[in-house]
Amino acid sequence: MATRLLRTNFIRRPYRFSALKPVGPPTVTASTAVVPEILSFGQQQTEPPLHQPNEANHHDIDLTDQARLFASVPTSDLFRSTAVLHAAAIGPMVDLGSWVMSSKLMDASVTRGMVLGLVKGTFYDHFCAGEDANAAAKRVKSVYEATGLKGMLVYGVEHADDAASCDDNMHQFLRTIEAAKSLPTSHFSSVVVKITAICPISLLKRVSDLLRWEYKSPNFKLSWKLKSFPVFSDSSPLYHTNTEPEPLTAEEERELEAAHKRIQDICRKCQESNVPLLVDAEDTILQPAIDYMAYSSAILFNADKDRPIVYNTIQAYLRDAGERLHLAVREAEKENVPMGFKLVRGAYMSSEARLADSLGCKSPVHDTIQNTHACYNDCMTFLMEKASNGSGFGVVLATHNADSGRLALRKASELGIDKENGKIEFAQLYGMSDALSFGLKRAGFNVSKYMPFGPVETAIPYLLRRAYENRGMMATGANDRQLMRMELKRRLVAGFS
């Protein structure tokens, strides 16, 4: 596999010296492997620190002039980043990687070690921040000091199947909060929790079924239900639950109580440490239970605060996203609970479509990408207006879309929002869209990188899912990869001149 990777055309191109032309000032995008190290290829220019935004750029998002960023990226890291991003955009390569990771090759210690070593030296090092919370915190520190980009610490486990695993994962999340607390507040923005890691998926499905049935049948009551905000609207997909579910057994109720305790322990630790907590979203089979747990926790830990501790995630590619957001915000305002929201487009389009089709129902996802963009921008505008009126709302705009960034910049100007007050920030995945991250940063916004960590074997499901989720987006990032290749060519020319 490694040999075939090295023989691909995109790696050969930087060495075709006959095709090289002067590229002038390097207008390149960013590698993610950013370290506080200055390279010297040819003449070195004196420039201000990367994390001091240029005031002249606060009225626009510059996605072309990345010379400052690349000045701190070693050529070896830039080369690896280009290779990894190119490979992640090749569908058959993603399929091959998935097959290898689930094949018998992983049963033999020799081949397993070789595969894990290859993964660690390529995809893992590019998309992950380290093998434990302390290593990830060090990576956050080095990235911030080199670039001014903050970090979101994410323990990269996908799910747990039993109580013991849920407890282990909870302790990992608590250690993550401790690691974040050890950093200067300027270096990090939040930690992220996946409810699927602290509550068995089977129980989340059961709770979601019961919540859907309660919404369908107002006379159907759930004795175990805590106070929460609305998790459905009239346009929400309810086809997952066509018959009345059996009530939770006594054992399931005890498991649910234990899951509530885990998330509340995590929230309490965040509250004590003044570390915001972002709750990740899942597919619509599980999302009602996740929304319920996020909102019930927010009511407990956000009330009477100037800023939220608990943030829930809204997926704008869902048709009902806007309605559910408005309902939740209205209820939060009524209860005087400052609420935080992370706004994403969504990542489960294929699986949502397959499930809906198998049930003879319409997909809960918007028909077109344009409708998803419109929904995202409408939700973004709504949340920015809420955050600007002193209500205490917090907003994390997780997007790789430059047009949404430009709209946010215009809206912030219209509303007179202080872009650096921490109530509104942008986020992109670690290892992706660094050009956008730097453009937004230089425009004056707080910008963070979503930085998962964990042992290589633990992170593999995350890496595979990330590859599948972002295959289309990676393919559309050809311009970024082209600019990275241009920077490699420029350095080679400068090195031989």
Indicate residue ranges for each PLM-predicted region:
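Positively charged, amphipathic and often flexible ligand-engagement surfaces
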Residues: 2-497
